[in-house]
Amino acid sequence: MFNEVILIGKLVDKPHLRETQQGIKMATMVLQVERPYRNNLGIRETDYINCILWRSIANQVSDCCEIGSFIGVKGRLQSR
């Protein structure tokens, strides 16, 4: 089995940066992703994907990305 996903979309809000109790940096963010096809009415639907970033990438995205920035995310899916 293989669990890998790549998303490209717009940053909806500024990432929320914090630390775990063990001192590991993490950030949460929402990515707005357009579907690659149109529905029956000819409209592209949009999904809002909650993402969690860890360690140095959490710092980088929090420092460098603004609301509305197009960014790419590569990771895995996990149910919570």
What are these regions (language model features)?
Residues 1-80:
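Single-stranded nucleic acid-binding surfaces, predominantly the OB-fold ssDNA-binding core
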